[in-house]
C-alpha cells in the first residue's frame, strides 16, 4: 500500500532519524533493527493493530552525502490517525517490550521525530504529470 493507492482519510507518518547506541557498530545496529526489533513489533498483535505500515530504511554505506550527522537509519511508521499513534505508544506491550529493546540498539536521546500529513506529490514517476495545488499538470515543464 502506498499513499497513491490509499483510499480514505489522510494518513499520518512518523518519520524517525535513528542513531545507534554508542559502542554499537553499524552492522550490529542494522542486524538488530532488521532481525530483532522489526519482527518484535510485527509479532506483537496489540501493537501491530495500530500501525498500517512500518518501513526500515538503513543508511546506505558508503554514504556520499555529508551533513546527515551520524544518522544510521530512518524509520517510517504509517498510522490512520494521530490517535492511532498515541494508542500505539500507550500500549503496555510498547512500554514492556519495544522501549527496552530500543535502548539496546538506539541512542534514545539522539532520535529526531517528525510527524507528517498527506504529502504533496511533485513528481510521480518518470515523465508523469502530477496534480499540484493548482490542479492537474498540463505536461509543460518549468
Predicted segments with their positions:
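Macromolecular interaction modules
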Residues: 6-142
Amino acid at each position: 500500500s502506498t499513499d497513491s493507492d490509499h483510499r480514505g482519510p489522510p494518513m499520518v507518518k512518523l518519520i524517525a532519524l535513528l542513531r545507534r547506541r554508542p559502542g554499537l557498530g553499524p552492522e550490529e545496529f542494522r542486524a538488530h533493527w532488521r532481525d530483532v526489533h522489526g519482527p518484535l513489533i510485527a509479532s506483537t498483535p496489540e501493537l501491530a493493530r495500530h500501525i498500517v505500515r512500518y518501513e526500515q530504511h538503513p543508511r546506505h554505506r558508503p554514504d556520499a552525502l555529508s551533513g546527515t550527522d551520524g544518522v544510521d537509519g530512518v524509520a517510517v511508521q504509517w498510522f490512520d490517525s494521530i490517535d492511532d499513534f498515541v494508542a500505539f505508544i500507550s500500549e503496555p506491550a510498547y512500554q514492556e517490550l519495544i522501549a527496552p529493546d530500543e535502548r539496546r540498539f538506539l541512542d534514545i536521546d539522539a532520535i529526531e521525530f517528525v510527524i507528517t500529513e498527506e504529502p504533496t506529490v511533485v513528481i510521480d514517476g518518470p515523465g508523469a504529470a502530477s496534480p499540484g495545488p493548482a490542479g492537474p499538470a498540463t505536461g509543460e515543464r518549468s
